[in-house]
């Protein structure tokens, strides 16, 4: 992994797998909690009913009104979108 940020992998049935490099932050706003994931964040797994914003130098992507599952481990954030 490069020292610039984290790697984000987004998978959904419509677009398949999309990968983003050098991401600075992943902001999760779910019905029960808010979470901001950055480089070297602890390992975490969970479910999202809400939105995810992915921001970096070359990327600014938002997923709104989704139901998804996520896992963050060793500076790789995986997002599996169900709806």
Located regions from the model:
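N-terminal export/targeting signal detector
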Residues: 1-7, 11
């Amino acid at each position: 992994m490069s020292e610039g940020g984290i790697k984000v992998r987004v998978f959904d049935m419509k677009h398949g797998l999309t990968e983003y490099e050098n991401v600075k932050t992943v902001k999760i706003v779910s019905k029960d909690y808010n979470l901001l994931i950055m480089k070297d964040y602890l390992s975490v797994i969970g479910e999202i009913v809400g939105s995810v914003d992915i921001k970096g130098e070359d990327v600014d992507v938002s997923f709104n009104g989704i139901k998804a599952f996520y896992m963050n481990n060793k500076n790789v954030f995986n997002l599996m979108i169900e709806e």
